[in-house]
Amino acid sequence: MRLRNLILLTCTISIVLYSNQIVAGDSVGLPAPTSTAEGQYPSHEHFSPYAGRNFPTQVFWGDTHLHTGMSFDAGAFGARLGPEDAYRFARGEELTSSTGLQVKLSVPLDFLVVADHSDNMGFFPRLNSGDAKMLANPTGKRWYDMTQAGGQEGVAAAVEIIESFSQGTFPDALASPPGSPAYRSAWDEAIKAAEKYNDPRSFTAFIGYEWTSNTGGNNLHRVVIYRDGESKASVMEPYTTLKPLGSDNPRDLWNWMGTYEEKTGGRLLAIAHNGNLSNGIMFPVVDSFSGDKFDLSYAETRAKWEPLYEATQIKGDGETHPLLSPDDEFADYETWDKGNLDLSAPKKDDMLQYEYARTALQTGLQLGRELGV
């Protein structure tokens, strides 16, 4: 310890002595502090590469893609907590989870987007509570009994419910489409929870939802995030994928977003995710719905509404793939590449370049040159 102190003391003295030399102008050819420096240096234009830059200096941590029991998938597989619980948990409160465990974050988040699926939002809370209209339907009563039984029966009910919705056989009597009292109630609950727990300069509770396009089992999901509060977000209910009120085409989602902004004066953005489960249609060079090549209008519209991309999440990493980045030792991180979202179609190697973020950037640069963006 003494030797260490001696070394530190020696270093400190050396620095002080060297500093005194500079101040005095000794041996380094600098003018003394009392003399003018005019004419001592060659004239030149001053330049700093960092002058004028205004980069953020504070990092905020949060989640832009969280589902609660209001969502069709999370609710199907046992989530019982709602939007208020999600915001409380994000702010650092201790909760009892849907499995009965006490849970708490090690560090509270700075922001959260509760992004429950817009299709059939609020279905599972109604089913789990034994809603009279649900139980009056034979299928609804059977699903209720299966979910209450839990275990393998509950899992079987979840799979059956999701498959029936995906295949278009979901009973109309059990649906919660936009415009229905049940849907309005669910959306109001989501909005009010965000408003209640939003605390400016401390915690930001964003209003949002997930638009869940799953054409042919191919994932084109987007999380839609509002930059607005209740007064604007409540004017229009979320966009869904089922016709005639909705669509599974991203262009139609962007049109809806434009209508919202024109009608309310508000602002929206969308964040796509899991291109790795799209089977080559998340970042294509031709329109997967029409087969047409993209034009300038498409490029500008997508860039406007989708400035961000969710590069990784629980259903696999979306940054790159070992076949696309063979020299990157981390390219095989959490790779999901067996097929599309529901595994109804297998993955082919020629699909990969249109699924991942790195090659999406390359494709974007290519389209930029071709379209003059």
Task: List PLM regions with ranges.
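Boundary at the C-terminal end of the N-terminal hydrophobic targeting segment
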Residues: S19, A24-G25
